[in-house]
Regions:
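Glycine/proline-enriched, intrinsically flexible loops and inter-domain linkers
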Residues: 1-247
Length: 247
C-alpha cells in the first residue's frame, strides 16, 4: 500500500501534480524495484493499493495549475518512495527547467544533476535522473541556432567524506547571452538538500545566479523570472545526489 495521506493541499502555484502523474511516478519506482524486464501496462499497478487524498497536491481539483507537477513534483514523489523503501538515496530531485527567448528565438532545456547512491554503488554525476526523460541539445547545435555561447559545462565538485557510497555530483552550466532575452527557471532543492540514506551525506543544494555585463551578480531563487541582456551570463549549479551508508 502506498498511502499519501498527509500530503499538503492544493498549491497556489503550478506545482500540483494530476493523479495520472502521481500514478506514473509510483509505477516508475516499483518497476525499478522489480529488477526484471516486465511489460509496461496497467497490470503493473494491480498489486499496489494507492491512497491519494482527493484535492491534495497529488490529485488537485480543476482549475489547479499543474505544469510543475509533471516536471518537479514527480521528482519529489520518486525520491520519497526510493527513500521510504530504503533502496536509494535522493537524486537531485529537480529537472532544473530553463527557458529563455525573445521575439526571434525560444529555447527550453532540463539540466542534469547528481544521482543518489545505494547499497553497493555510488551515484552517477551530471546525469538526467528518474522522471526527466529528456536529453540536452548539443552545444554546437545550440550555439549555431541561438545567440548564446556555452562558457562552461562541467561537473561540480562535491566532497563526500561521510558516506560509504557517495552521491553523484551536480553540473555547472554557464551561458553567455549575445542578445536581450527573457528567462524563466523552474527548479528545486535550492534550500533543502537531497537527503542521504542510512547515514549517508546529503547532496549539495543547487544554486543559480546572473552575472551582469558590468560584473554585478544577482542570486536566483528556485523559481525565477528575469531579463537578460547582451553580455550577461546565466550560471546554474544543479543539486547533487545523496550518499548511502557510513564508512
Amino acid at each position: 500500500m502506498i498511502d499519501f495521506t498527509g500530503t499538503s493541499g492544493r498549491h497556489e502555484g503550478n506545482f500540483n501534480a494530476p493523479k495520472a502523474i502521481t500514478r506514473a511516478a509510483v509505477l516508475y519506482v516499483f518497476r525499478c524495484l522489480v529488477g526484471a524486464d516486465i511489460p509496461l501496462n496497467d497490470g503493473c499497478l494491480k498489486p499496489l493499493r494507492l491512497i491519494i487524498p482527493e484535492g491534495c497536491l497529488l490529485d488537485p481539483a480543476f482549475p489547479a495549475a499543474v505544469v510543475a507537477g509533471n516536471v518537479e513534483t514527480s521528482q519529489a514523489i520518486t525520491n520519497a518512495l526510493f527513500l521510504a523503501t530504503g533502496a536509494l538515496a535522493a537524486s537531485q530531485g529537480t529537472m532544473n527547467n530553463l527557458t529563455f527567448g525573445n521575439a526571434r528565438h525560444q529555447y527550453y532545456e532540463t539540466i542534469c544533476g547528481g544521482a543518489g547512491a545505494g547499497n553497493g554503488f555510488a551515484g552517477a554525476s551530471a546525469v538526467q535522473t528518474h522522471m526527466t526523460n529528456s536529453r540536452m541539445t548539443d552545444v554546437e547545435i545550440l550555439e549555431k541556432r541561438l545567440p548564446v555561447r556555452i562558457d562552461s559545462f562541467s561537473i561540480r565538485e562535491q566532497k563526500d567524506s561521510q558516506s560509504l557510497w557517495p552521491g553523484g555530483a551536480g553540473a555547472l552550466r554557464s551561458i553567455l547571452f549575445l542578445e536581450d532575452m527573457e528567462m524563466n527557471l523552474l527548479s528545486g532543492h535550492r534550500t533543502i538538500a537531497p537527503p542521504g540514506l542510512a547515514g549517508g551525506q546529503d547532496g549539495a543544494v543547487g544554486r543559480g545566479r546572473i552575472i551582469r555585463a558590468d560584473g554585478e551578480e544577482e542570486r536566483l531563487d528556485a523559481v525565477e523570472q528575469a531579463s537578460l541582456y547582451a553580455g550577461d551570463r546565466l550560471v546554474i549549479e544543479t543539486p547533487g545526489g545523496g550518499g548511502y551508508g557510513r564508512p
